[in-house]
Amino acid sequence: MIMNIHIVEQPEFAAVFTLPSPARDHSGIGHLVEHLVFRTSHLFPERHNLFALTSLTQCKMNASTTGDTSYYFAQAQTSEDLLLLIEYLYTGLMTRTYKESDIEQEKSVIQHELAFYAKHPAYQTQSQIWRGDHHSCAYQHWGGFPDVLTHLTANDIDAYKSQYYVDHQLSIFASGILKEDIVTACNKGRLNHAKLSNHHNQPKIYQPKLTTNDTEDDMPVPVFSWWLAGKYQASVLRQFPKWQIQWPELYVEEELNHQGMFAIRYVGEKELSQFSTWLACQTVIAGSEMTKMTKFPESIQALLSSEISNTSQPRNLSSKSNAAMPISQLIDEPCISHLARLPITNIHTTQTLDLTSTTLATAAEPPTIIKRFTGAIAFELGSYQPKTIMQLLADIGDKEICIKADLWLIKFTPISLEKMTAIVQTSAFWAPRVRGLLYTMGVFELAGDIYVWGAGDIQPTTNISYIQALIDSSQH
């Protein structure tokens, strides 16, 4: 094994895998691979392992993919359980082949996810800018455009993972465990991968098909982009809120592109000359790389900070490089593109849920990762509720159901926590998410009541009826 293993001294039992996952196009292949890593593997075949574990234990596990890197993290209460999570993640990372149904269902999940994000104006603007920018320094949409995502195949996944999801590209930063124990845990995940052959084909490049609506408009909105080195990004973003008060059309990218640069954008031509003159006079200071993944648990952020300190980047900047510099000395003429129109994408769902079945598997065995978990398994341990769902709590009152657009919340009372613990371990409970019928779902307890929620759901009444039927059947 030639994976890079780094042990960091900190009290938490935590680990994070990092590996390159460049966005080669607008398909979101790195995003799809991220979903598939958690979905299934030869050691952990059940599609709901992740959901059951994070709902019933104090473990934390998630991932995030940017334009050039993917991060997979885990945090547990004991070293034994952290090593189990590492084995689970590593096995998923090394898995290359998937059933067509798994790929199509995760595509559907991502389409629901992208539709969920598309409700936010800032996301729409960013997507329009990226889709309309065809310069060599342009960002590729690592989350994917729905109409491009659909083209990805099992062969593309195999080719992509064989190129990037390999040991010599992989690093793990961990605390609370020993290096040799990590090697042992990962070797378990390698048993069925020893004879993996190299996939010699490159993943196909998929880009949006240009249509008349994309390129022609009565009044196309221009976008002017000035590109700066990544070391100035933190300085620009610190000043951005103040700048935007004066210039509402100003937009600053929060990620780096494949060349390690970021863009300062100006949308439209209103007062463009004045803005250009003003921008050239602003000053910035070179700094270290920005903190990564600030939404991750603090223990994971500490591990990632250790990763940065292990790079070859110079730590001591000279006083000259630390001095404030006018932006005019750092930029060339702006690149000019246009806001693209975003196509309307219909989410095609072929899966259905049987609402009449009397065998809803509420007594099914727990998934593999729960069987092997050494810590406590209890419904209330993993209680979690996102802010978007908590907003529905104020409106549900004495009602059993609250629906707002693609968000929903169901209240169950009374039902025992022991019974709910059993239900949440079943594949039947997670069927709407696993089959790609919504973006995400979850369950939590509050003041003695049980709540089940869903988000990014284009057919909320169907999935609500299914969950209600499932819970009702378990009480007879």
What residues fall within each predicted segment?
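Structured beta->alpha junctions
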Residues: 21, 76-78, 456
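Acidic/histidine-enriched segments that form metal/cofactor-coordinating
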Residues: 42, 50-160, 197-212, 219, ...
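Small-residue-rich helix-loop
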Residues: 455-460, 468
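Small/polar loops that bind or transfer phosphate-bearing groups
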Residues: 74, 174-175, 455
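Catalytic adenosine-cofactor/nucleotide-binding cores of aminoacyl-tRNA synthetases and other
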Residues: 450-452
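His/Glu-rich zincin catalytic helix
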Residues: 1-49, 158-283, 324-435, 465
